[in-house]
Regions:
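Hydrophobic alpha-helical segments
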Residues: 1-92
């Protein structure tokens, strides 16, 4: 299977750099998912807009991460499990 590598920050489009800096500021690092989406700044923007919209729902951060962990488990996504385990720990 072909893999798309994460872009080093310096190689990302200027339009994506501001968004990636916001992610770095919020999380303390830039997860590979976002660095990979930066290949297509419109995809990164769309993903972040969706995440932001879902974050405004009635579920708190802890409940959202429980759902994300369950979904990751069902889908067999080891990367997603690792990422959402980290975010679940941060959410409490």
């Amino acid at each position: 299977m072909t893999r798309i590598t994460a872009l080093p920050f310096e190689q990302t489009a200027t339009s994506a750099q501001a968004q990636l800096e916001g992610i770095r500021k919020g999380l303390g690092f830039i997860p590979n998912t976002f660095a990979t989406l930066a290949h297509a700044p419109a995809a990164l923007s769309g993903y972040l807009a969706l995440s932001q919209a879902l974050g405004k729902g009635t579920l708190n951060a802890k409940a959202r991460e429980v759902v994300a962990l369950a979904s990751s488990q069902v889908n067999g996504c080891e990367y997603c499990l690792a990422a959402h385990s980290l975010f679940a720990d941060k959410a409490g």
